[in-house]
Structure formats: C-alpha cells, structure tokens
Regions:
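Terminal targeting signals and extreme-terminal segments of soluble enzymes
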Residues: 1-77, 85-144
Length: 144
C-alpha cells in the first residue's frame, strides 16, 4: 500500500475568526489521515500504537511541514491524499495533498519514526516486518 484517499469536513472548531481553517489544524488533519492510512495498512484491527515483541510501539515525529496554497472555509469538504514519499528502515515520510473541488489547498509532510515508547527513553527501531511488508513508497510521480 502506498496511497490512501480520505475526506475531512471543516468544522467550526477548525476555523479562526475569519472562518478559514487555522493553520495549526492542518497538522491535526494530517495526523488523523496518517492514522487512517496505518489502520488500513495493518488491516487486522490494530491501532497505530501497538505492542511488538513485548514493547509498546509509537511514532514520534522527526519532521513536519505544511505549505498553504488557498484557504479552506467552514463547511468545506477537503479531499486528502496520503502517499508514502519515503520508507526507510526506521521511519516513514508521508506526503499529504489537500484539495477542494480539484484546487490545491495545502501540501504537507510528516516523517514518523518507529520507536519503542514504553521505557524511560525513546528508542528508534526497525519498522516491524508485518507492517513494513504492507507499506511501499509511492511511485515518484505520485509522491510529489
């Protein structure tokens, strides 16, 4: 799996006083879409944070960014395309393309690092095979 399409309705709580989406909300939208991507890739009822070899696994962020192209407003139904821009042994970089009626709204990226999170400090680990085998990088034309 290298891509997922989903949608998100802009709610009142997502907007600022001008009734456009507050810039910070796009990071919430990206995280929700990432979680949907991972749940779909896992396909077995597991949640994004799961146990593997006796340890809790989580996905802290190494890098996030978002570039805004045009405003989204209260009530808009955003189309969100999530694609895997890069899959390393210990991290995944997702690309998020937001659009409204075919017009670009924003583009973002998240690099999530696979880590053991239950102990006193985070430890980056290889993405477990049962997940790594289900995720692949998007073709170059798709990931941009």
């Amino acid at each position: 799996m290298h891509e997922l399409h989903t949608q998100r309705r802009v709610e009142f709580a997502d907007t600022d006083m001008a009734r456009i989406v507050h810039f910070s909300r796009f990071f919430d939208f990206m995280e929700a879409a990432e979680h949907e991507f991972l749940r779909t890739a896992l396909g077995d009822g597991r949640q994004v944070h799961f146990e593997y070899e006796g340890h809790e696994i989580g996905w802290p962020r190494g890098r996030v960014s978002c570039e805004y192209k045009s405003p989204a407003r209260l009530g808009d139904l955003l189309d969100i395309r999530v694609s895997v821009a890069r899959k390393g042994t210990k991290s995944i970089t997702y690309r998020f393309d937001f659009s409204l009626d075919g017009q670009a709204v924003a583009h973002g990226e998240i690099t999530a690092i696979c880590c053991r999170v239950g102990g006193p400090k985070l430890e980056a680990i290889a993405i477990p095979p049962f997940l790594a085998d289900r995720i692949e990088e998007a073709p170059a034309a798709t990931a941009r």
